[in-house]
């Protein structure tokens, strides 16, 4: 019985650590077609510099769509064909932050954008 209680306690501790991970996006807004926006994602609760990061988006009534990827060091970057040449992903490991510069915005870029590990 005592071993069982210890196991439950250990699981609770691990779940508590997981719950401290936070990714908070900001920078959205309304712009005209052809305009620009810069999204930011502030990370906390984990070693940001050790993780590859992504931007994904969800247009109204649609599923999740992957937008862009950046390696932990920032040396490797990929984009979805739909945003290539218009969007730029970057990161600042010293500030635990991820960015997405979006230029030449189109109506079809309308979506909720999320950063993801």
UniProtKB/Swiss-Prot annotation:
Bilayer-crossing regions: none
InterPro entries named in the record: Ig-like_dom, Ig-like_dom_sf, Ig-like_fold, Ig_V-set, IgHV
Chain positions covered by the region annotation Framework-1: 20-44
GO-annotated cellular components: extracellular region; immunoglobulin complex; plasma membrane
Keyword NAD in annotation: no
Domain Ig-like: start-end pairs: 20-117
Annotated signal sequence range: 1-19
Subcellular locations according to the entry: Secreted; Cell membrane
Gene Ontology MF terms in the entry: antigen binding
UniProt entry keywords in alphabetical sequence: Adaptive immunity, Cell membrane, Disulfide bond, Immunity, Immunoglobulin, Immunoglobulin domain, Membrane, Secreted, Signal
Gene3D superfamilies for the chain: Immunoglobulins (2.60.40.10)
Region (Framework-3): 78-115
UniProt xrefs under Pfam families: V-set
Region ranges (Complementarity-determining-2): 70-77
Region (Complementarity-determining-1): 45-52
Changes after translation: The N-terminus is blocked.
Disulfide bonds: 41-115
Framework-2: annotated span: 53-69
Keyword Cytoplasm: no
Role description: V region of the variable domain of immunoglobulin heavy chains that participates in the antigen recognition. Immunoglobulins, also known as antibodies, are membrane-bound or secreted glycoproteins produced by B lymphocytes. In the recognition phase of humoral immunity, the membrane-bound immunoglobulins serve as receptors which, upon binding of a specific antigen, trigger the clonal expansion and differentiation of B lymphocytes into immunoglobulins-secreting plasma cells.
Subunit comment: Immunoglobulins are composed of two identical heavy chains and two identical light chains; disulfide-linked.
Name the record gives this protein: Immunoglobulin heavy variable 3-48
